[in-house]
Amino acid sequence: MAFLTVFTPAYNRAHTLPRTYESLCQQDCKDFIWLIVDDGSTDETADLVKGWQKEKNGFEIQYIYKENGGMHTAYNTAYANIDTELSVNVDSDDYLTDTAIEDILSFWKKNKRENIGAIYALDQYEDGNVVGTPFPNDLKEFKGWGYKNIVYYSGGKKKVFRNSGDKKLIGVTAVINKYPPIPVFEGEKYHSLYYKQHLLERDYTVLIMNKPVCVVEYMNDGSSKNMFYQYVRNPKGFCNERRYVMKYAPSFKLKIEACIHYVAESLLAKDYYFIGHSTNRLFTLISVVPGVLLYFIIKRKTKK
């Protein structure tokens, strides 16, 4: 059996998937499976994949079609069908570096031990620049609250690394599947993909592989405005994520930010008993006024 599954959720991405496929074909190490989860595509994705499955490319290609439900539901489907030791997501418009599979395998063989839940590696843009901030050289592993705010010890000193930019999670599949699927709310097609990672980082050690393994496309698409629309369309999913953050975040600032968003998104979901449903009622009560203000800002920004 292969040691790694590369899984790719896809929705009408027949025009970008060939680049992902070519990057997999170029790998010297073919000890992996490529799993495409088709999230209800209406383009030529299925025919494209069927053609690739017939080619002598050196690795197994698995294909699952499902009704459109959003990226998080595609993740749930992927994890339910992965049985390799490690798994990594590569989006349908991204592709692997030339030595990614070999680099991951080599790193895992060298550093594998009990109580490891995942590896974080780097993403890079097509121009070679790393996405966000590279990890410090003295940061080898961590356990606790998320890769955005990592507390670690080096040289006998306590240090804090405040990360910017996405990082590539390479999960230990058996650990990831100990946690429940990402919640799905009726009528909503978005939930933070970080759901399982939050739980994993709390319970297991995460290794740091300070090297790019995936090339991502820079999207200058007005994402902040788009996020306002996501709040309106998927308020229950956002509320669910905020409940976790307000309970477990290590700082007052992070908890208050989560509570402010929770208030606004609860109002968008027409949940007027949000204080009773909160996992941090005191902080939520403190956040009511700014949360209501944020609610009106979101409504104004998304007014047609």
Each predicted region: which residue ranges?
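Short, well-formed alpha-helical segments that are part of the catalytic scaffolds
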Residues: 12-26
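Short beta-strand/loop segment that forms part of the nucleotide-sugar
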Residues: 31-40, 62-67
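Glycine-rich, basic loop-to-helix element that forms the pyrophosphate-binding segment
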Residues: 66-82
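Short aromatic/hydrophobic "clamp" motif used to bind/position activated sugar donors
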Residues: 87
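Conserved donor NDP-sugar-binding/catalytic core segment of glycosyltransferases
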Residues: 99-135
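Conserved nucleotide-sugar donor-binding catalytic segment
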Residues: 129-225
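C-terminal subregions of glycosyltransferases and related glycan-biosynthesis enzymes
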Residues: 207-304
